[in-house]
């Protein structure tokens, strides 16, 4: 018979209320003069890789074949309205990746989940509602997700990284 262990973390508040949906703010350093690392793609993996490189003191250079998240909106609308697909800017290519214009739900099928709390904190730091930290089914929302993605890019730029759109790596 197997023994099941439960690892439980508890925060105790005595004579005070727990803070509502607090999140950890990451202090990203200026990496303008640090060694450069090329990141191909500005989807979720590329954006989070770039932010992690900044945390580690490296300067990310993000190269994305599609357009920025707000310019993509027009191209995606053309797909629905005019049935015209831009091969370089559509649901698959562009800042934010395939999920940028999805329903905004945060979901993974991966069995190797990694540090989900840190990912949610990064989203909160960049404009997502802190409620995603405690929701059973976190949801940023279609209306907010493009702004969150843009804020992530702005953090990369503010810290000295670079982001190039409409640039292929052939």
Predicted regions, residues:
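Residues forming the flavin
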Residues: 1-170
């Amino acid at each position: 018979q197997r023994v099941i262990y439960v690892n439980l973390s508890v925060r105790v508040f005595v004579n005070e209320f727990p803070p509502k949906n607090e999140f950890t703010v990451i202090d990203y350093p200026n990496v303008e003069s640090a060694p450069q690392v090329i990141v191909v793609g500005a989807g979720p993996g590329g954006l989070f890789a770039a932010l992690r490189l900044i945390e580690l003191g490296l300067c990310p250079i993000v190269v994305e074949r599609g357009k920025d998240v707000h310019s993509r909106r027009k191209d995606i609308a053309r797909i629905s309205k005019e049935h015209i697909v831009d091969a370089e800017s559509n649901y698959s290519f562009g800042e934010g990746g395939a999920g940028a214009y999805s329903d905004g739900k945060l979901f993974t099928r991966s069995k190797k989940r990694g540090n989900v709390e840190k990912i949610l904190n990064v989203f909160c730091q960049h404009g997502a509602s802190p409620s995603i930290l405690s929701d059973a089914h976190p949801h940023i929302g279609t209306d907010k997700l493009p702004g969150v993605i843009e804020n992530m890019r702005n953090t990369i730029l503010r810290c000295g990284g670079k982001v190039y759109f409409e640039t292929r790596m052939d």
